[in-house]
Regions:
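N-terminal helix-turn-helix DNA-binding core of bacterial DNA-binding proteins
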Residues: 1-39
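A cross-family signal for key residues in well-ordered alpha-helices
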Residues: 12, 45, 54, 80
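Basic amphipathic alpha-helical segments that dock to polyanions
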Residues: 40-42, 46-47
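Glycine-centered, phosphate/nucleic-acid-interacting loop/turn motifs that mediate DNA/RNA or nucleotide
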Residues: 51
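Conserved catalytic-core motifs of GNAT/GCN5-like acyltransferases
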Residues: 56-60
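Basic, amphipathic "hinge/linker" alpha-helix immediately C-terminal to the N-terminal HTH DNA-binding motif
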Residues: 61, 65-83
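Amphipathic alpha-helical dimerization/coiled-coil segments
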Residues: 77-106
Length: 106
């Protein structure tokens, strides 16, 4: 499940604007999702190979050129599907949890 959530969060971040890997890691860290580059790069590669992401090289003032990722049209469509699925899951959980309290056994 974490993989699906991580993928969803990454696509949400990239949907805002083209981003560099360290920007993705920083945003995930702020959201308390700790991810290392060794996890992120294969996932980005899989999303790119699946036609959901593209990238462009941009010059950097602080070193070598950087690869900035952005969503393709297919990526935006897939993100919308994930958004719909997430909303369905959230709605289901809310329905199940209404007036549900956890009993404490004494």
């Amino acid at each position: 499940m974490r993989k699906g959530i991580l993928e969803y969060c990454i696509l949400l971040i990239i949907n805002k604007k083209p981003v560099y890997v360290s920007d993705i890691i920083s945003e995930l860290k702020e959201a308390h999702l700790i991810v290392v580059e060794g996890t992120l790069y294969p996932l980005l590669s899989r999303l790119k190979n699946g036609g959901l992401l593209s990238y462009q090289w941009q010059e950097s003032m602080q070193g070598p050129p950087r690869k900035y990722y952005e969503l393709t049209d297919a990526g935006r469509s897939f993100l919308q599907e994930l958004e719909n699925a997430w909303n369905d899951i959230r709605h289901t959980i809310e329905k199940v949890s209404v007036d549900n309290t956890i009993a404490v056994v004494q």
